[in-house]
């Protein structure tokens, strides 16, 4: 009797996933056509949700294990994907997929490590890098060596992991009886200014004012290096560029005034966009970047902005207009800590604001869900947005 009850419950869950998935397909089609009936919801998260959650990660894998052993990275990513698809509701596909589409994912350190920064591992946090260019002389000597080989150094490891994943797929490897599908690679960028800040420990910010001419040459070197790496990897995996839908990031521009951004970083962004994007680009900026909104609108002509919790969404909509997609920005700490009453209040505040004008708003967190965030908190926010985020 108990077995039959469990079987029915399982069948009902699968049926619920299928119903949800069909609704989600219609929602995104309507959103693409400019006529969604409600506000879509997207959560941004990665396999750090698995690695840094001791309840899920019963083997106790650390990021150092994931970064040194491709089978551990593969396992961590698949465990995360399975958990996400069966526990965290939003407007994505739920349940088992036809194929596991995953990527070689070295978090946010691979570009800095490729340039020479050592990885720094923390027990309860995602990996970071140790700055290695602290002085003008070190930066100058670094540039004198020229742009690194796009497939050497840390990127050699990335390539090895990618080829290992492909080999596993070709061997017929399955997880939960589902085969591997598309294998993604790091063809994008976290942004030239952010990478420059990472590898110099922020010294480049001081250099902008102490020696602007040298700082500008250093930033161009970084941008050119990142661009060459991206071009090589696009070609390696067979992605033709430029293309529609290109998105990049550069979080550390929040440290700059509009004048400094326009002088030192905007030209780098334009070069990257011209190289990889047809049409209008998207950008992820999870800091306090309201001072750059007009420049992003008038100079980069963005079509999409992924925001962090400091962003005033109503201001963003006012400045960017109604034809730019904006995603955000329920505070990650609110989702992590709760209580549900606060989550509900903040969700209602956001979806009831003027950011929804033009029906080009995607509700989500600001930015990137913290490990150990209770799924019930995420699901509560989703249900509130789904119920009250309907357009009339």
Residue spans for each PLM region:
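Membrane helical hairpin/interfacial module
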Residues: 63-117
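Generic hydrophobic, aliphatic-rich segments that mediate packing or membrane embedding
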Residues: 73, 77-80, 138, 157, ...
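Extended interaction regions within the primary functional domain
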Residues: 88-108, 135, 177-185, 239, ...
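Basic, gly/Ser/Thr/Pro-rich low-complexity segments located predominantly at protein N termini
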Residues: 100, 108, 121, 333, ...
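Active-site loop segments of alpha/beta catalytic cores
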Residues: 1-59, 63-66, 144-392
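Aromatic- and acidic-residue-enriched carbohydrate-binding clefts of CAZyme catalytic domains
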Residues: 118-138, 246-255, 327-329
């Amino acid at each position: 009797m108990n077995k039959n009850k469990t079987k029915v419950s399982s069948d009902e869950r699968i049926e619920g996933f299928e119903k949800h998935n069909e609704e989600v397909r219609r929602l995104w089609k309507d959103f693409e056509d400019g006529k969604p009936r409600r506000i879509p919801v997207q959560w941004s998260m990665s396999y750090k949700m698995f690695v840094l959650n001791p309840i899920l990660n019963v083997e106790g894998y650390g990021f150092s294990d994931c970064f040194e052993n491709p089978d551990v990275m593969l396992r961590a990513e698949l465990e995360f994907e399975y958990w996400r698809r069966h526990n965290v509701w939003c407007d994505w596909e739920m349940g088992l997929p036809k194929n596991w589409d995953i990527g070689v994912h070295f978090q946010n350190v691979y570009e800095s490590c490729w340039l020479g920064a050592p990885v720094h591992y923390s027990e309860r946090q995602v990996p970071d890098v140790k700055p290695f260019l602290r002085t003008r002389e070190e930066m100058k000597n670094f540039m004198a060596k020229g742009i690194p080989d796009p497939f050497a150094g840390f990127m050699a490891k990335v390539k090895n992991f990618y080829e290992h994943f492909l080999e596993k797929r070709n061997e017929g490897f399955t997880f939960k009886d589902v085969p591997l599908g598309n294998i993604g690679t790091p063809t994008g960028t976290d942004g030239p200014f952010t990478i420059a800040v990472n590898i110099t420990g922020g010294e480049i910010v001081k250099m902008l004012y102490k020696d602007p001419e040298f700082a500008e040459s250093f930033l161009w070197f970084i941008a050119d290096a990142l661009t060459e790496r991206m071009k090589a990897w696009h070609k390696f995996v067979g992605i033709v560029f430029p293309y529609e839908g290109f998105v990049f990031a550069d979080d550390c521009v929040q440290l700059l005034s509009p004048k400094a951004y326009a002088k030192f970083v905007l030209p780098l962004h334009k070069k990257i966009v011209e190289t990889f994007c047809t049409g209008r680009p998207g950008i992820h900026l999870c800091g306090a970047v309201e001072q750059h909104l007009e420049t992003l609108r008038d100079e980069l002509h963005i079509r999409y902005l992924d925001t962090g919790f400091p962003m005033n969404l109503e201001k963003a909509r006012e400045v960017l207009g109604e034809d730019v997609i904006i995603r955000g920005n329920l505070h990650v700490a609110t989702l992590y800590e709760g209580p549900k009453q606060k989550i509900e209040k903040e969700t209602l505040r956001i979806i009831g604001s003027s950011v929804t004008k033009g029906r080009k708003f995607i509700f989500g967190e600001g930015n990137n869900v913290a490990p150990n965030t209770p799924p019930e908190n995420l699901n509560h926010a989703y249900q509130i947005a789904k119920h009250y985020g309907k357009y009339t």
